[in-house]
Amino acid sequence: MTDNVNHPRHYTQAAAQLEPIDVLRYAPFCIGNCLKYVIRAGYKGDALEDWRKAQLYYAWATENLIQTEEFLLNYATLLVKFDRLSLLRTAPSQFLEDLKTMIGGNIRALEIVCKQN
């Protein structure tokens, strides 16, 4: 009997014997969906439709790449700033200004990405 929840047939029959979740759980949404449709093309429903969906998600991922990179850079910078909590003790006003700037940048980048998806 096929386990349609944990191992759906349209994924386990694919030539690569690779279930999308093995890769997708680590991928950004649009890239993950692109890969999902490529892996299952021809095994569930209309193959051409899956390829078109993959192409569409690839285009969206490409459009969002710059915003995503900026978001990740800002997020990484924010984490570094949090790691330097000693600045909070020595220069609290500067720390708070930096924090406001970084959080504001992340919120703007996230809003842009969400609006495009």
Language-model segment annotations:
Residues 1-117:
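Intrinsically disordered, low-complexity regulatory regions
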